[in-house]
Amino acid sequence: MARYRCCRSQSRSRCRRRRRRCYRRRRRCCRRRRRRVCCRRYTRYRRR
């Protein structure tokens, strides 16, 4: 659960700039349970 702590309660624009931490582990900001979190890999949730 602590792994998904990249873009949790951030805005879509802030999530894009705050996903630098996830970028290091090849992770992307995704939407999970109606909230933004760091995904393990580029999932199919490629929604803008």
UniProtKB/Swiss-Prot annotation:
InterPro entries from the UniProt entry: Protamine_P1
Superkingdom to which the source organism belongs: Eukaryota
GO biological process: chromosome condensation; sperm DNA condensation
Molecular function GO terms recorded: DNA binding
Tissue expression per record: Testis.
Chief location category: nucleus
Function: Protamines substitute for histones in the chromatin of sperm during the haploid phase of spermatogenesis. They compact sperm DNA into a highly condensed, stable and inactive complex.
The protein's name in its UniProt record: Sperm protamine P1
Source species: Corynorhinus townsendii
